[in-house]
């Protein structure tokens, strides 16, 4: 309330977003779950049930830690206290400074990171209860921890060493450290980490096609990219010199957070997403060790960035359906297809055919007179 105004949530930006150019899909409005409140236990129960129903194995939660101070911790604590939410989970430390970046004020820091050897130890101690949870994701028997911007750590290698020593002291077999491939090129050996996880749209060599679109907002200064081109290329990429976890995104558009200045991917559809996911699954399935056959989706519910598997009013369950259909080729869950068929059987079929009328002809013109209507020799509306 102090920083953003009383009652502000992500939904504030999501609901007021508007189209910035012709064909721009905004706003992204939620479907089944509505404008939910994550402080309510029943909401998280719905999310877990929905994810499991469509074959998703776990959630990666952002963890906000600023020199001992936590933010947005209530949903995570609620999850830990409810073992009935039977789905895997892990943490990604969002280790940036907390700033007013949504307003475009990059230097207006609200809460800064505070790094020290003592804070490294305190950070691991704060995570210990989650690491002990049987639902927590482990790789080679070690709890997995992702760091969003490893290059921001003053001495990442020293921090990694302290973390490894501390988890051993706490009785764990070690820790599996993963650097997110965000703003910097990552060499895990340099930072003392074990693996890298892709984080599209970061580090993706995007194709800018902004000039192909007509702006609706004359002050629009955002960027428009081709999702389909990215999906065809990025899903097949792999590296042999370090362990790389693949990540797929269903779509992306952060204009809700940065009106008129966002980055938007067009041509994002469930079909294109499914093809990207299938490519990433093929790469992941080739891993020699089962624990390394792990794949991420960005994201489950980043509504203000247009990246969500949760149902919306445009696509409904199509992205979840596409996810389940692709995973069913690789995921050893014999009941997944049965659940998918049962879910789809519940939809009401309203039409047997779709009629598409092309209304653009050379002899078609717009006439004003008591109202607007289109007219041609053969068609009048």
Over which residues does each language-model region extend?
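ER/Golgi luminal nucleotide-sugar-dependent glycosyltransferases, focusing on the catalytic module
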Residues: 316, 325-381
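Glycan-processing catalytic domains of CAZymes
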Residues: 1-344
């Amino acid at each position: 309330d102090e920083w953003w105004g009383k009652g502000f949530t992500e939904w504030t930006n999501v609901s007021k977003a508007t189209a910035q150019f012709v064909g721009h899909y905004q706003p992204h409005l939620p479907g089944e779950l509505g404008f939910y409140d994550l402080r309510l236990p029943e909401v998280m129960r719905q999310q877990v049930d929905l994810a499991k129903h469509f074959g998703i194995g776990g959630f990666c939660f952002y963890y906000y830690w600023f020199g001992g101070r936590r933010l947005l911790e209530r949903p995570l604590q609620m999850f830990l206290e409810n073992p009935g939410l039977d789905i895997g989970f892990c943490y990604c430390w969002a280790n940036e400074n907390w700033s007013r970046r949504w307003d475009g004020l990059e230097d207006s820091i609200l809460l800064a990171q505070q790094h020290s050897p003592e804070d490294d130890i305190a950070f691991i101690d704060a995570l210990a209860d989650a690491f002990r949870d049987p639902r927590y994701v482990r790789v080679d028997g070690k709890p997995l921890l992702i760091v969003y911007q490893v290059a921001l750590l003053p001495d990442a290698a020293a921090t990694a060493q302290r973390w490894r020593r501390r988890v051993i002291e706490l009785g764990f077999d070690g820790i599996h450290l993963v650097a997110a491939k965000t703003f910097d090129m990552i060499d895990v050996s340099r930072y003392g980490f074990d693996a890298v996880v892709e984080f599209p749209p970061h580090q993706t060599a995007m194709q800018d096609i902004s000039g192909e679109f007509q702006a609706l907002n004359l002050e629009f200064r955002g960027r428009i990219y081709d999702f389909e081109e990215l999906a065809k290329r990025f899903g097949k990429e792999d590296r042999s010199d370090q362990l790389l976890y693949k990540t797929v995104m269903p779509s992306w558009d952060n204009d809700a957070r940065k009106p008129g200045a966002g980055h938007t991917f067009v041509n994002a559809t469930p079909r294109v997403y499914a093809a990207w996911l299938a490519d990433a699954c093929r790469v992941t399935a080739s891993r020699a060790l089962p624990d390394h056959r792990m794949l991420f989706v960005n994201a489950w519910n980043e509504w203000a960035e247009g990246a969500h598997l949760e149902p919306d009013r445009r696509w409904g369950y199509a992205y979840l359906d596409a996810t389940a259909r692709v995973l069913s080729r690789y995921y050893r869950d014999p009941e997944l297809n049965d659940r998918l068929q049962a879910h789809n059987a519940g939809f009401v079929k309203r039409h047997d055919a779709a009629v598409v009328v092309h209304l653009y002809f050379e002899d078609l013109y717009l006439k004003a007179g008591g109202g607007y209507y289109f007219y041609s020799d053969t068609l009048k509306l």
